[in-house]
């Protein structure tokens, strides 16, 4: 990804916005990408004392979206406005998050299809996550049963498709209603849909693998009660 530095945020940390980016900003329960921005043209491409024309790289430690701008928090001095940079996403971290995010959608689909129980919340890190569901109580033998069902779904290698629907159509789709598409702000007129074909369909803005087998393996680490009608699963992807 090659982009031009467009703005700089003032504050405790150095953050820059670009005219385009391939970095995923924290949102929808998925953490941000990491990586580097390398100055390749313009002010700062080579500093005094550098070897001839040496490029300067800045480590990206956080990515946040505010309004229309995506802010990349970096270590080091921000390049001048108009500087051209190359962005390199940490693919190992990104792919682990893709696998994890898809696994969470598989889990939601399996639990709905088997028990008709909706998800109430969740959070993820690379290859680990927690998900909360409206169980009260958890069924007997739930952890081993859901682990088996999710791994079977992974092995079936369901294809994953991404599409965009007008909001007026999305809010009438039964699967999207179940996954609370109506909670998306009304200012969003086009809804991005991630469909694990034949298993689960959700409005979602995150990153995913191309088919379920790419996820790997799924393991339930722990179940917890977070109160009446709210049970938590902690899981790992291998």
Model-based region annotation:
Residues 1-238:
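Active-/binding-site microenvironments in catalytic and ligand-binding cores
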């Amino acid at each position: 990804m090659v982009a031009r530095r467009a703005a700089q945020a003032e504050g405790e940390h150095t953050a820059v916005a670009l005219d385009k980016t391939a970095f995923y900003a924290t949102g929808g329960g998925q953490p941000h990408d990491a990586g580097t921005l390398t100055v390749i043209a313009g002010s700062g491409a080579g500093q005094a004392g550098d070897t001839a024309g040496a490029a300067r790289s800045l480590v990206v430690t956080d990515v946040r979206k505010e309004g229309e701008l995506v802010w990349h928090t970096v270590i080091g001095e921000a390049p001048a406005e108009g500087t051209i940079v190359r962005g390199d996403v940490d693919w190992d971290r990104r792919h682990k998050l893709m696998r994890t995010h898809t696994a969470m959608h598989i889990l939601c689909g399996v639990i709905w299809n088997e028990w008709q129980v909706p998800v109430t919340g969740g959070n993820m890190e690379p290859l680990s996550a927690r998900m909360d569901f409206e169980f009260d109580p958890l069924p007997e033998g739930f952890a081993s049963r859901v682990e088996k069902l999710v791994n079977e779904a992974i092995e079936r290698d369901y294809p994953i498709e991404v599409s965009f629907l007008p909001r007026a159509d999305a809010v009438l789709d039964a699967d999207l209603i179940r996954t609370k598409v109506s909670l998306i702000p009304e200012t969003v007129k086009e809804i991005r849909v991630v469909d694990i074909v034949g298993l689960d369909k959700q409005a979602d803005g995150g990153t995913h693998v191309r088919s379920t087998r790419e996820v790997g393996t799924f393991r339930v680490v722990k179940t917890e009660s977070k109160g009446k009608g709210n049970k938590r699963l902690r899981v790992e992807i291998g």
